[in-house]
Curated annotation (Swiss-Prot):
Protein name, entry field: Seed agglutinin 1
Source organism of the structure: Robinia pseudoacacia (Black locust)
PANTHER family according to UniProt: CONCANAVALIN A-LIKE LECTIN FAMILY PROTEIN, LECTIN
Gene Ontology molecular function, alphabetical: carbohydrate binding; metal ion binding
Post-translational modification comment from the UniProt entry: N-glycosylated; three of the four potential glycosylation sites are occupied.
Pfam families linked: Lectin_legB (PF00139)
Keyword Calcium attached: yes
Lineage: Eukaryota, Viridiplantae, Streptophyta, Embryophyta, Tracheophyta
Matching InterPro entries: ConA-like_dom_sf, L-lectin, Lectin_LegA_CS, Lectin_legB_Mn/Ca_BS, Legume_lectin_dom, Leguminous_Lectin
Residues in the signal sequence: 1-31
Protein backbone atom coordinates (compact mmCIF):
# COMPACT_ATOMS: atom_id res chain seq x y z
CA UNK A 1 0.00 0.00 0.00
CA UNK A 2 1.48 3.33 -1.02
CA UNK A 3 0.02 5.38 1.81
CA UNK A 4 -1.16 4.45 5.26
CA UNK A 5 -1.67 5.49 8.85
CA UNK A 6 -0.30 3.75 11.89
CA UNK A 7 -0.44 4.31 15.62
CA UNK A 8 2.26 2.89 17.83
CA UNK A 9 4.47 4.02 20.68
CA UNK A 10 7.54 3.33 18.54
CA UNK A 11 6.42 5.20 15.41
CA UNK A 12 8.00 8.56 16.18
CA UNK A 13 11.49 7.18 16.99
CA UNK A 14 11.31 5.12 13.80
CA UNK A 15 10.53 8.21 11.71
CA UNK A 16 13.36 10.12 13.37
CA UNK A 17 15.74 7.28 12.52
CA UNK A 18 14.62 7.30 8.89
CA UNK A 19 15.04 11.09 8.74
CA UNK A 20 18.53 10.92 10.23
CA UNK A 21 19.56 8.15 7.81
CA UNK A 22 18.37 10.15 4.81
CA UNK A 23 20.26 13.23 6.02
CA UNK A 24 23.42 11.15 6.28
CA UNK A 25 22.95 10.01 2.70
CA UNK A 26 22.60 13.61 1.54
CA UNK A 27 25.74 14.66 3.38
CA UNK A 28 27.75 11.86 1.75
CA UNK A 29 26.82 12.88 -1.79
CA UNK A 30 29.73 14.48 -3.69
CA UNK A 31 27.88 17.57 -4.75
CA UNK A 32 28.71 21.16 -5.59
CA UNK A 33 25.07 22.25 -5.71
CA UNK A 34 23.41 22.30 -2.31
CA UNK A 35 21.06 24.29 -0.13
CA UNK A 36 20.72 24.07 3.62
CA UNK A 37 18.95 26.17 6.23
CA UNK A 38 17.33 25.91 9.63
CA UNK A 39 14.78 28.22 11.24
CA UNK A 40 14.18 26.99 14.83
CA UNK A 41 11.91 30.03 15.01
CA UNK A 42 11.20 32.95 12.71
CA UNK A 43 12.08 36.63 12.95
CA UNK A 44 9.85 39.57 12.00
CA UNK A 45 10.92 41.01 8.64
CA UNK A 46 12.78 37.76 7.99
CA UNK A 47 15.19 38.61 5.11
CA UNK A 48 15.40 35.04 3.82
CA UNK A 49 11.66 34.71 3.16
CA UNK A 50 9.28 36.20 0.62
CA UNK A 51 5.86 36.95 2.09
CA UNK A 52 2.77 36.99 -0.11
CA UNK A 53 -0.70 38.27 0.76
CA UNK A 54 -1.56 37.79 4.47
CA UNK A 55 1.56 35.93 5.64
CA UNK A 56 3.71 37.49 8.37
CA UNK A 57 5.92 36.63 11.33
CA UNK A 58 4.50 37.42 14.76
CA UNK A 59 6.41 39.02 17.62
CA UNK A 60 6.70 35.55 19.18
CA UNK A 61 8.53 34.11 16.16
CA UNK A 62 5.65 32.22 14.56
CA UNK A 63 5.15 32.19 10.79
CA UNK A 64 1.45 33.09 10.58
CA UNK A 65 0.28 32.26 7.07
CA UNK A 66 -3.33 33.47 7.33
CA UNK A 67 -4.94 36.40 9.13
CA UNK A 68 -5.94 36.50 12.77
CA UNK A 69 -8.08 39.47 13.81
CA UNK A 70 -8.62 40.07 17.53
CA UNK A 71 -7.68 36.48 18.19
CA UNK A 72 -10.07 35.05 15.59
CA UNK A 73 -9.18 33.82 12.08
CA UNK A 74 -11.37 35.47 9.42
CA UNK A 75 -12.71 33.79 6.30
CA UNK A 76 -11.25 34.35 2.81
CA UNK A 77 -7.66 34.72 4.01
CA UNK A 78 -4.71 33.52 1.94
CA UNK A 79 -1.02 33.70 2.73
CA UNK A 80 2.23 32.26 1.42
CA UNK A 81 5.86 32.30 2.54
CA UNK A 82 8.66 31.27 0.16
CA UNK A 83 12.36 30.76 0.67
CA UNK A 84 13.85 33.79 -1.07
CA UNK A 85 16.69 32.19 -3.03
CA UNK A 86 15.78 30.22 -6.18
CA UNK A 87 16.57 26.52 -5.86
CA UNK A 88 18.01 24.38 -8.68
CA UNK A 89 15.95 21.19 -8.56
CA UNK A 90 17.63 19.67 -11.64
CA UNK A 91 20.54 20.45 -13.97
CA UNK A 92 19.80 20.94 -17.65
CA UNK A 93 23.45 20.31 -18.58
CA UNK A 94 24.03 17.04 -16.72
CA UNK A 95 20.46 15.83 -16.34
CA UNK A 96 21.06 15.33 -12.61
CA UNK A 97 18.17 15.83 -10.19
CA UNK A 98 18.38 17.03 -6.59
CA UNK A 99 17.38 14.97 -3.58
CA UNK A 100 16.06 16.93 -0.62
CA UNK A 101 14.63 16.66 2.86
CA UNK A 102 12.58 19.24 4.70
CA UNK A 103 10.98 19.22 8.13
CA UNK A 104 8.67 21.67 9.82
CA UNK A 105 6.22 21.96 12.69
CA UNK A 106 2.82 23.57 12.44
CA UNK A 107 -0.37 24.16 14.40
CA UNK A 108 -3.85 24.44 12.94
CA UNK A 109 -6.42 25.70 15.43
CA UNK A 110 -10.11 26.30 14.77
CA UNK A 111 -12.70 28.15 16.88
CA UNK A 112 -15.15 25.40 15.90
CA UNK A 113 -13.46 22.05 15.21
CA UNK A 114 -16.48 20.92 13.20
CA UNK A 115 -16.08 23.67 10.60
CA UNK A 116 -12.43 23.84 9.59
CA UNK A 117 -11.21 25.21 6.26
CA UNK A 118 -9.26 25.06 4.21
CA UNK A 119 -5.70 23.85 4.73
CA UNK A 120 -1.95 24.27 4.53
CA UNK A 121 0.59 22.98 2.00
CA UNK A 122 4.30 22.76 1.28
CA UNK A 123 4.95 23.32 -2.42
CA UNK A 124 7.55 23.83 -5.16
CA UNK A 125 6.73 26.06 -8.12
CA UNK A 126 8.31 28.33 -10.77
CA UNK A 127 10.54 31.13 -9.49
CA UNK A 128 7.96 33.79 -10.36
CA UNK A 129 5.09 31.95 -8.63
CA UNK A 130 2.17 34.06 -7.45
CA UNK A 131 -0.77 33.23 -5.15
CA UNK A 132 -3.53 31.07 -6.56
CA UNK A 133 -7.18 31.16 -5.60
CA UNK A 134 -8.87 31.24 -2.20
CA UNK A 135 -10.45 28.43 -0.22
CA UNK A 136 -10.03 24.94 -1.57
CA UNK A 137 -7.32 25.96 -4.04
CA UNK A 138 -5.09 26.49 -0.97
CA UNK A 139 -3.54 29.59 -2.54
CA UNK A 140 -1.58 27.42 -4.99
CA UNK A 141 -3.85 26.66 -7.95
CA UNK A 142 -6.19 28.85 -10.01
CA UNK A 143 -8.86 26.18 -10.60
CA UNK A 144 -9.56 22.48 -10.25
CA UNK A 145 -8.28 21.36 -13.65
CA UNK A 146 -4.99 19.61 -14.42
CA UNK A 147 -2.59 21.89 -16.28
CA UNK A 148 0.97 20.82 -17.13
CA UNK A 149 1.96 24.47 -17.43
CA UNK A 150 1.34 24.93 -13.68
CA UNK A 151 4.70 23.24 -12.95
CA UNK A 152 3.79 22.67 -9.30
CA UNK A 153 4.35 19.84 -6.82
CA UNK A 154 2.73 20.09 -3.38
CA UNK A 155 2.05 18.15 -0.21
CA UNK A 156 -1.26 19.30 1.25
CA UNK A 157 -2.77 19.07 4.71
CA UNK A 158 -6.42 19.59 3.86
CA UNK A 159 -9.01 20.22 6.57
CA UNK A 160 -12.08 20.59 4.35
CA UNK A 161 -13.45 18.09 1.86
CA UNK A 162 -14.49 19.85 -1.35
CA UNK A 163 -16.94 17.55 -3.15
CA UNK A 164 -15.64 18.45 -6.61
CA UNK A 165 -12.02 17.42 -6.12
CA UNK A 166 -11.34 15.99 -2.64
CA UNK A 167 -11.83 12.59 -1.01
CA UNK A 168 -14.26 12.41 1.87
CA UNK A 169 -12.88 13.80 5.11
CA UNK A 170 -9.71 15.55 6.17
CA UNK A 171 -6.66 14.23 4.40
CA UNK A 172 -3.03 14.55 3.37
CA UNK A 173 -2.38 14.62 -0.36
CA UNK A 174 0.36 14.81 -2.96
CA UNK A 175 -0.48 17.17 -5.80
CA UNK A 176 1.10 17.38 -9.24
CA UNK A 177 -0.06 20.29 -11.44
CA UNK A 178 -3.57 20.08 -9.99
CA UNK A 179 -5.50 20.53 -6.75
CA UNK A 180 -6.77 16.98 -7.40
CA UNK A 181 -4.24 14.88 -5.50
CA UNK A 182 -2.49 11.95 -7.18
CA UNK A 183 -2.43 10.21 -3.78
CA UNK A 184 -4.32 10.85 -0.54
CA UNK A 185 -4.47 9.36 2.93
CA UNK A 186 -7.03 10.11 5.67
CA UNK A 187 -5.71 12.50 8.29
CA UNK A 188 -7.12 12.75 11.80
CA UNK A 189 -6.40 16.42 12.38
CA UNK A 190 -6.24 17.39 16.06
CA UNK A 191 -7.24 20.90 17.06
CA UNK A 192 -4.38 22.99 18.43
CA UNK A 193 -1.83 20.15 18.56
CA UNK A 194 1.71 20.58 17.23
CA UNK A 195 2.25 18.47 14.10
CA UNK A 196 5.78 17.55 13.02
CA UNK A 197 6.22 16.95 9.29
CA UNK A 198 9.08 15.30 7.43
CA UNK A 199 9.15 15.35 3.60
CA UNK A 200 11.83 13.71 1.48
CA UNK A 201 12.49 13.35 -2.23
CA UNK A 202 14.91 10.69 -3.47
CA UNK A 203 16.02 11.55 -7.01
CA UNK A 204 17.25 8.07 -7.93
CA UNK A 205 13.85 6.49 -7.27
CA UNK A 206 11.68 9.58 -7.94
CA UNK A 207 10.09 8.87 -4.57
CA UNK A 208 8.27 11.67 -2.73
CA UNK A 209 7.48 10.74 0.87
CA UNK A 210 5.73 12.70 3.60
CA UNK A 211 4.99 11.87 7.21
CA UNK A 212 3.07 13.80 9.85
CA UNK A 213 3.46 13.01 13.54
CA UNK A 214 1.53 14.24 16.56
CA UNK A 215 4.17 13.53 19.24
CA UNK A 216 1.77 14.07 22.14
CA UNK A 217 -0.67 11.54 20.67
CA UNK A 218 1.86 9.02 19.28
CA UNK A 219 -0.08 9.09 16.01
CA UNK A 220 1.47 9.22 12.54
CA UNK A 221 0.29 9.52 8.95
CA UNK A 222 2.44 8.62 5.94
CA UNK A 223 1.97 9.13 2.21
CA UNK A 224 4.12 8.28 -0.80
CA UNK A 225 4.03 8.83 -4.56
CA UNK A 226 6.37 8.54 -7.52
CA UNK A 227 6.93 12.02 -8.97
CA UNK A 228 9.37 12.85 -11.77
CA UNK A 229 10.25 16.41 -10.77
CA UNK A 230 12.40 16.81 -13.88
CA UNK A 231 9.28 16.28 -15.98
CA UNK A 232 7.01 18.43 -13.79
CA UNK A 233 9.11 21.33 -12.49
CA UNK A 234 11.32 23.91 -14.21
CA UNK A 235 15.06 23.70 -13.62
CA UNK A 236 14.92 26.49 -11.02
CA UNK A 237 12.08 26.77 -8.51
CA UNK A 238 10.99 28.49 -5.35
CA UNK A 239 9.43 26.56 -2.49
CA UNK A 240 7.61 27.22 0.75
CA UNK A 241 4.18 27.26 2.36
CA UNK A 242 0.70 28.32 1.36
CA UNK A 243 -2.51 28.30 3.40
CA UNK A 244 -6.10 29.48 3.21
CA UNK A 245 -9.17 29.84 5.37
CA UNK A 246 -12.66 29.04 4.13
CA UNK A 247 -14.93 31.11 1.96
CA UNK A 248 -18.14 30.49 3.93
CA UNK A 249 -18.86 32.11 7.31
CA UNK A 250 -17.49 30.11 10.23
CA UNK A 251 -15.24 27.83 8.18
CA UNK A 252 -11.95 29.18 9.48
CA UNK A 253 -8.72 28.15 11.20
CA UNK A 254 -5.27 29.43 12.03
CA UNK A 255 -2.33 28.19 9.92
CA UNK A 256 0.90 28.68 11.86
CA UNK A 257 4.37 27.28 11.11
CA UNK A 258 6.62 27.10 14.17
CA UNK A 259 9.95 25.92 12.71
CA UNK A 260 11.43 24.85 9.37
CA UNK A 261 14.57 23.21 8.05
CA UNK A 262 15.67 22.13 4.58
CA UNK A 263 18.65 20.33 3.07
CA UNK A 264 19.38 19.27 -0.50
CA UNK A 265 22.14 18.10 -2.80
CA UNK A 266 22.34 18.31 -6.58
CA UNK A 267 25.35 16.43 -8.02
CA UNK A 268 27.26 18.81 -10.28
CA UNK A 269 24.84 21.67 -9.70
CA UNK A 270 25.52 25.33 -8.95
CA UNK A 271 26.41 26.56 -5.48
CA UNK A 272 23.73 28.61 -3.76
CA UNK A 273 23.64 30.76 -0.64
CA UNK A 274 22.32 29.05 2.48
CA UNK A 275 21.39 30.07 6.00
CA UNK A 276 21.55 28.36 9.36
CA UNK A 277 20.08 29.15 12.74
CA UNK A 278 17.35 31.47 11.55
CA UNK A 279 19.62 33.70 9.53
CA UNK A 280 22.25 34.28 12.20
CA UNK A 281 24.95 33.06 9.84
CA UNK A 282 25.27 32.47 6.12
CA UNK A 283 27.60 30.40 4.02
CA UNK A 284 28.15 29.29 0.46
CA UNK A 285 27.34 25.61 0.05
Amino acid sequence: MASYKFKTQNSFPLLLSISFFFLLLLNKVNSTGSLSFSFPKFAPNQPYLIFQRDALVTSTGVLQLTNVVNGVPPRRSIGRALYAAPFQIWDNTTGNVASFVTSFSFIIQAPNPATTADGLAFFLAPVDTQPGDLGGMLGIFKDGSYNKSNQIVAVEFDTFSNIHFDPKGRHMGINVNSIVSVKTVPWNWTNGEVANVFISYEASTKSLNASLVYPSLETSFIIHAIVDVKDVLPEWVRFGFSATTGIDTGYVQTNDVLSWSFESNLPGGNSVASVKNAGLSTYAA
